[in-house]
Design a protein with these regions (language model features):
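Short amphipathic alpha-helix used as the core "switch/output" element in two-component signaling
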Residues: 41, 65-77, 94
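Receiver (REC) domain active-site loop signature in two-component systems and cognate sites
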Residues: 59
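Two-component/phosphorelay signaling modules centered on CheY-like receiver
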Residues: 2, 11-34
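A Lys-centered signature of the CheY-like receiver
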Residues: 106-107
């Protein structure tokens, strides 16, 4: 089972992501966070089972990019998929530098 953490400050988008994850065999939503500090606490908690993070870039008070070093430094081998409207080259390059496994640009067609 792949345990997914959803990090998005938009409650509706987070819920849609949760519903989608629930429909995919072998995946389950292990939690969600609406702020980077909540996400950091979950990632740094060894009791939390997290294999994959679905991460937004544009959040009200933060940038999801700021969470990427925390994820890498945790040493837990957590994969990241960015799901965001941020389509500029610098943001994509920064995300790729930190080893995100995919970068999906909203809105989807």
């Amino acid at each position: 089972m792949i345990n997914v953490l959803i990090v998005d400050d938009d409650a509706m988008v987070a819920e849609l992501n949760r519903l989608y994850v629930a429909r995919v065999p072998g995946f389950r939503c292990s939690g969600s966070a609406s702020t980077l500090s909540q996400a950091q606490e979950m990632i740094n908690d060894p009791q939390q089972e997290i294999d994959l993070v679905l991460l937004d870039v544009y959040m009200q008070q933060d940038s999801g990019l700021d969470l990427l070093p925390t994820i890498r430094e945790s040493g837990r081998g957590i994969d990241v998929i960015m799901i965001t409207s941020a389509a500029d080259a610098a943001t994509v390059q920064t995300a790729m530098h930190y080893g995100v496994v995919d970068y999906l640009i909203k809105p989807f067609q």
